[in-house]
Amino acid sequence: MLLLRWKRFWFLSLGILLFSGVVSLMLFNLSESISFFYLPSDVARVVASNREIKVGGIIKAIKKSKDGVRFLLSDGAAEIEVLYEGILPSLVQDGINVVVVARFEGGLLLAKRVLVKHDERYYPPEDFIKSVRGE
């Protein structure tokens, strides 16, 4: 009888240990794949130089220059200037929500990618811009 209790105890303990190990591995892998983005008002206090981050906000004042495209990214509380060397997606214009993957250097975000934020519904480009602006 005592031997049966010890076997049951060790079997249950091993099961709990195995289950907690699997759950721990799942949570660890999930935490690596989740990607958050910062708001422009958070960038200055949380970002170290030369570290790649994601920053989300609303585009304001797009200007084309010889070194790329410059625009302001705003969250309503703060604005930060972004430099993107490349061709912007066709949906990018003033008032559109975007997420940029960039490095922060000297008060300027050097963008590697610009992603347009949208929901799961498909809109032709003209209708998308109208829906974002509330027309």
Curated annotation (Swiss-Prot):
Residues 1-8 are cytoplasmic. InterPro entries: CcmE, CcmE-like_sf, NA-bd_OB-fold. Residues 30-135 are periplasmic. Keywords: Cell inner membrane, Cell membrane, Cytochrome c-type biogenesis, Heme, Iron, Membrane, Metal-binding, Signal-anchor, Transmembrane, Transmembrane helix. It is a single-pass type II membrane protein. Heme binds at residues 118, 122. GO terms for molecular function: heme binding; metal ion binding. Gene3D superfamilies: Nucleic acid-binding proteins. It is found in: Cell inner membrane. Disulfide bonds: none annotated. One of its GO terms (cellular component) is plasma membrane. GO terms for biological process: cytochrome complex assembly. Heme chaperone required for the biogenesis of c-type cytochromes. Transiently binds heme delivered by CcmC and transfers the heme to apo-cytochromes in a process facilitated by CcmF and CcmH. This is Cytochrome c-type biogenesis protein CcmE. It comes from Neorickettsia sennetsu (strain ATCC VR-367 / Miyayama). The gene is ccmE.
